Amino acid sequence: MLPRTKYNRFRNDSVTSVDDLLHSLSVSGSGGKVSAEPAASPYLVSGEALRKAPDDGPGSLGHLLHKVSHLKLSSSGLRGLSSAARERAGARLSGSCSAPSLAAPDGGSATPGSRAPAASMSATRKSRASDEPLPRPPRGAPHASDQVLGSGVTYVVKYLGCIEVLRSMRSLDFSTRTQVTREAISRVCEAVPGAKGAFKKRKPPSKMLSSILGKSNLQFAGMSISLTISTASLNLRTPDSKQIISNHHMRSISFASGGDPDTTDYVAYVAKDPVNRRACHILECCDGLAQDVIGSIGQAFELRFKQYLQCPSKIPALQDRMQSLDEPWTEEEGDGPDHPYYNSVPNKMPPPGGFLDARLKARPHAPDAAQFSGKEQTYYQGRHLGDAFGEDWQRAPTRQGSLDIYSTPEGKAHMVPVGETPTYVNTQPVPPQVWPAATSSTESSPRKDLFDMKPFEDALRNQPLGPVLSKAASVECISPVTPRAPDAKMLEELNAEPWYQGEMSRKEAEALLQEDGDFLVRKSTTNPGSFVLTGMHNGQAKHLLLVDPEGTVRTKDRVFDSISHLITYHLESSLPIVSAGSELCLRQPVERKP
């Protein structure tokens, strides 16, 4: 209610009409915001209704109070309305020609020109609402598995650069890994102009962190990029020219961290590539996007791991990973002496449930074995067999993918004196792509973190190795598989040959050789099912395996029908058996004694 001055009979106290009052309010700044929306609220009273009310004269105080009270109720109702209700009321107002305007000083209806702004405003609001994007999914919600398994999930982030990591992340515990990524984020943010910076005031880095982190690469620092996350790789490229900044395969990523309380807008992950070798890459993800990015990375690794468990043959766990070991940037070079491996620390026992138990479960009927050192490894015509098919085979370590799988003795150890170990003909050097870094071992970390990025190693420990090892034996012959037992036809054919001595030890066979060219074929006493050709060359005894693990009789360049076919061919043609640059000529057979 408007304040009233004290009544004075010499003063004209006639109150202004409601229409004049509304006009004055519309002219003033505060009253210009009042709009005419008659149907928006039950408290609204139109100006026409007010004008139709009986006018008792300008001095009628009751009539004035009645009108002003309705006016206040109308304005309060407008303020309490939602934006959607106001738009609907404005649309109805613009569509009705008889709707009057409260701001009209003469009490007439609103002109078409006054309705045009309201109609255009309503149309603008409607079009703006239709152009708004759909609401985003809640933070942390996983994406569709098909999308992550296929083309991947794409984010637009800012790439701040990378900093070199001089030590393997697997050699550090989880706390140290987190400190390394935090320090990398701080260093890169300080070096990049315009970066927010992870820490305003931070302590100087420790000597340990200074020895782990190296030089930084700021070639693409501050550039907005498209980050695509899939089960295959993390791809970083420019959104306009599609230039690839880096493409890190999942098997080359060792650690990832992001969304920490002190670094809420940053994601850091450690990966290897040919340019930066092992480096920590920093991404700036504003508006809480860091949690989504790190969650998508974790989802990609989880789906990749499940895919491996469902179908191990589709994961390049053997040949592709072995080929990757040839490249210096995928091998943990120089990390061996720094790792506290159990097989290099005195009195250190291996962790339970490791390679030993998995190997024993996979080979329940393996022959007797023993651990030894200093013995020459055996190769079959250029293919590495460990020592599986040697004359006194004692089970050598086998490389499975990136792991070193060691077996344990299952029976009584049978040691061969070093002096009695003969020299093999087929002892050519190991190809680097077949047996790289045979002395390295996989460290068992006491604490597992979510983004360790090495899930396949633990899976290989607990998964049956039968199908994978069989495939390895047929491709590179790097796994010791028991040879096939000879059939009755082969034994009958061999017994008819004069140079076949039957079951005989190596020492007994060497005693029968007198001069170069002498040879015989015998059955191994320590490895059942194996047949060995023993001959003399340059005064030294040579021993060659004649049957490969798949039961095929062959040399380096030819396959034969049987052992008799192989011996007859080389004996009649006088062609030597060549292996590893050494020759063995078959001239005089040593006949079997009756």
Curated annotation (Swiss-Prot):
| Domain SH2 positions | 499-590
User: Could you tell me what this protein is called?
Assistant: SHC-transforming protein 3
Q: CDD domains recorded for this chain?
A: PTB_Shc, SH2_SHC
Tell me the Gene Ontology biological-process terms attached to this UniProt entry. cell surface receptor protein tyrosine kinase signaling pathway; intracellular signal transduction; learning or memory; synaptic transmission, glutamatergic
**What PTM annotation applies here?**
Tyrosine phosphorylated.
GO cellular component terms given for this protein: cytosol; plasma membrane; synapse
What is the annotated tissue distribution of the protein whose record heads this document? Predominantly expressed in the adult brain, in the hippocampus.
What species is given as this protein's source? Rattus norvegicus
Q: Which is an annotated GO molecular function term of this record? A: signaling receptor binding
Phosphoserine-modified residues are 402
InterPro entries documented for this protein: CEP152/SHC-Transforming, PH-like_dom_sf, PID_Shc-like, PTB/PI_dom, SH2, SH2_dom_sf, SHC_SH2
Segments of this protein annotated with the region Disordered: 95-147, 428-447
- Start and end residues of each PID domain: 149-334
| Known role | Signaling adapter that couples activated growth factor receptors to signaling pathway in neurons. Involved in the signal transduction pathways of neurotrophin-activated Trk receptors in cortical neurons.
Source organism, top-level taxon: Eukaryota
Keyword terms, alphabetized: Phosphoprotein, SH2 domain
Q: How does the annotation summarize its subunit structure?
A: Interacts with the Trk receptors in a phosphotyrosine-dependent manner. Once activated, binds to GRB2. Interacts with activated EGF receptors.
Instruction: Name the Pfam families for this protein.
Output: PID, SH2
Q: Where is this region: CH1?
A: 335-498
